Amino acid sequence: MIIAPKVRGFICTTTHPAGCEANVRQQIAYVKSKGPLANGPKRVLVIGASTGYGLASRITAAFGSDAATIGVFLEKAGTEKKPGSAGWYNSAAFDKAAKEAGLYSKSVNGDAFSDECRAKVVELIKADLGQVDMVVYSLASPVRKLPATGELIRSALKPIGEVYTATAVDTNKDELIEAHVEPANEEEIANTIKVMGGEDWELWLQALDQAGVLAEGVKTVAYSYIGTDITWPIYWHGTLGRAKEDLDRASSAIRQQLSSKNGTANVAVLKSVVTQASAAIPVMPLYIAMSFKLMKEQGIHEGCIEQIQRMFYTRLFDGEFVTDDAQRIRMDDWELRESVQQACRDLWPQVTTENLSQLTDYQGYKAEFLKLFGFGWEGVDYTADVNPEVNFDVVAM
């Protein structure tokens, strides 16, 4: 079939297999261009491995450090009538490239919140790798089925305490709007912590530890975002921030758990990037369009792969292991430079629908968004007939 982009709300409902492969190949080429990672991991589990920072972590481990990788995700395969999800095609492309390079690659497609999924991964590690020396936790899901009760819990993207009102961009109409978001109640706050907090990360590390599949000196990282005063009302001071604070609690608990094997557990605070997750947060698209323009002008712009490659190569494995007071690895350091943030604050009141594309990198934001789904990649013939059915080495749960 010939596949064109169809955008509804903040998701693109179609995906392009060849474009997704181009995305993965480009990320691999970037990591290879940086040379090998001297003291990198060799057996890596990535939970949430199919898009964004999780995918970038899997690519960096494999192609920077020749690591064997197991990726866990929940994605949809394509059928002859309908394309699959971008994460499915990304993972298929990764698997193909890894095997071409002679690297071990296995994927598990299932609910990463479930005990069954954990058991399957433990079984795979025992059979194929023995142990893992790194566990990356990069899940972004709006819902979680609690393994103990089967109860389905939904998160809420809301402020706490008062209505949040701010200028935002309607990405469908390309115009500025006033966004009003009602504050969360106590139940919504608790639910968001349950879905997006650190409990599941803890459950994973407990299961892996109890099964004896964590190597001496194992490192685990979970990804977070803090942002700045511009986005704090909807993010860090809202329900999402409470969940991310719970990641800090979990990281401390996991650190204690791993101390007997000299393991480490840290939250890595990353910069804002265009992802399916960030597109859903009011104000983020406008803030990202602004910060992208400023960071590109200052020569410090990074996407997912640049961030993760820098973290692996300069913080986690080579270079100095520096953390903040809460033991977090701060990869948002460039974005938080005052030269970027003050310029954003100055720019915010000046932006109108008419000057949106001049004052911000809004067109760059839109292009990046479509690229997530495989559209707009150079060298891909979008008029060609493509097969939406792409199979690879994946364990279906």
Curated annotation (Swiss-Prot):
Task: Give the residues annotated as active site.
Answer: 235 (proton donor)
- Detail which positions bind substrate: 225
A single GO BP: fatty acid biosynthetic process
Named from the GO MF annotations, one term is: NAD binding
Function of the protein: Involved in the final reduction of the elongation cycle of fatty acid synthesis (FAS II). Catalyzes the reduction of a carbon-carbon double bond in an enoyl moiety that is covalently linked to an acyl carrier protein (ACP).
Keyword Signal attributed: no
Give the gene that encodes this protein.
fabV
- Name it: Enoyl-[acyl-carrier-protein] reductase [NADH]
InterPro entries from the entry?
Eno_Rdtase_FAD-bd_dom, Enoyl-CoA_Rdtase_cat_dom, FabV-like_NADH_b, Trans-2-enoyl-CoA_reductase
HAMAP family listed in its UniProt record: FabV_reductase
Reactions catalysed, as given in the entry: a 2,3-saturated acyl-[ACP] + NAD(+) = a (2E)-enoyl-[ACP] + NADH + H(+)
The UniProt site entry described as Plays an important role in discriminating NADH against NADPH is assigned to 75
- Pathway membership: Lipid metabolism; fatty acid biosynthesis
Subunit structure of this entry? Monomer.
Per the similarity annotation, which family is this? Belongs to the TER reductase family.
Q: Where does NAD(+) bind?
A: 48-53, 74-75, 111-112, 139-140, 244, 273-275
Q: Any idea which UniProt keywords this protein has?
A: Fatty acid biosynthesis, Fatty acid metabolism, Lipid biosynthesis, Lipid metabolism, NAD, Oxidoreductase
- The EC number(s) given in the record are 1.3.1.9
